[in-house]
Amino acid sequence: WKPESTEWYHPVPPKVTPGVGTSAPSDAIILFDGKDLTKWEAAGKDGGSAKWAIKDGTMVVVPGSGSIRTKEYFGDCQLHIEFKTPIPGKDNTLQMKGNSGIMLQSRYEVQVLDCEDNPTYVNGWVGSVYKQSAPLANAFTKTNEWQVYDIYWKAPRFGTNDELESPAMITVVLNGIVVQNNYVLKGNTPYTGLPKYVAHGRMPLSLQDHGVEVAFRNIWIRDL
């Protein structure tokens, strides 16, 4: 063997300028810029305008207004999203304490929850793949502080007859701590019942209205 027999020069990877501080990489799709919800719509069957509020450069769940989803569809991706849970009321405990969710392809949930002194079930903690995989650590800092998610998603693949060819896989980093490490999903993430796969293609990213005024900011995504 010659050294050059295992070297190649094409295709040349594209140049991407990394973000500095809180800015996104040069090839990222900005899903929320702190100004408006033009990249989002209501997640119901008929779509329509997203009804969440814009406050001080963040978007905030309006309880009862419904979940929202991106107008654009995604498959494999790198997602950056920051969230802040509010100071809870007396009735906001367990799964009602700062609850929302990040629904990859509108059906695979990474949990958003205030896990400061919260004795709820561990596969429903922040950093969990909801009701499938508990986080490797509780990396939540404090109530009413910004938390940072970086999520690396490999979408499931389906064959010509809608059979599952390869399951979804996810790595989740919360506040710089790996909380899911190449976890292989068993299917979707239902509240009741067992996970299962139903064939689909590229789908929107959804954010959940769970009746709590969770705030989000600095949301961007890269197609992989």
Predicted segments, located by residue:
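Carbohydrate-interacting regions of secretory-pathway proteins
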Residues: 1-224
